[in-house]
Amino acid sequence: ASRLIDIHSQHQNLILASEEFRNASARIVLLHIPLGNGTWHGNIHLEELFLPILNDADIDVMLSGHTHRYSFHPANDKVRFPVLVNDNESLLKCDVGDGKITARIYGPEGTVTHSHEFPLK
């Protein structure tokens, strides 16, 4: 297991050090299981694996699912980027422009149920 973690961490470090990542206009992380708000062993493992890398990567926002419930977690001392979790019945759309990421969640009826803006770093 530790070898897998080492390989995974090395791969993430290569991506984050790449010219494409450094020059990206927006840095959005997609991760099924949200970081920073769980006590399940899977959450803890992912936090140990990814937080040291992502916290230093100027991430604009993380988009997640897993819980099947909407939630929003602003950046804090543990997770230094906002985490937006979508439920299992809604559509999440993001637009990048004008120095920000605009995220809108559309419920089953097609109306906006939640909206967030994240300034680009």
Task: Say what each PLM segment does.
Residues 1-79, 112-119:
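His/acidic metal-ligating clusters that form di-metal
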